Amino acid sequence: ENVIYINKAQTAELYPTLAHEGYPGHLYQNVYYAARNDDPVRYLLDYPGYSEGYATYVEGFSYSMMDAEGYGDIYQQMNMEMYEYNLALCSRVDLGVHYEGWKKKDVRAYLRSFGMNDSQADELFQMIIENPANYLSYYIGYQEFHELLTDYKKNGRE
């Protein structure tokens, strides 16, 4: 049985979260994949850039499906751009910490220039320390799916 549990305390992002975790995101992706009966070795391997990239792409795409109640395309575009911005910013901090050796003070200083306070910076720093390259799997995977669609459209296939 496929179940998605909803945190009723945080419903502001419910629509894109359901797109990411449910349909057309991970739920669709996993049910489709399981039905293919692929080589068993593929079930042993983990491809977070592929799985999270796909779910992140469809989550972002969900913003274009929202009923913006009179705000139209501007509202949808703003949400999508803010979503990409946040992924890019967190990915940049991840690279700073794990590749360039940033310390907590460096993350705080960097994020202050984007309007984030120290407690927000500390929370992001802790998540990045605990899960290296996690944001990169979402963001780079998302970019790969975006590029795939762009190439597909460029070659006249729609």
Predicted region positions:
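Long, His/Glu/Asp-enriched segments that create or flank divalent metal/ion-associated functional microenvironments
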Residues: 1-158
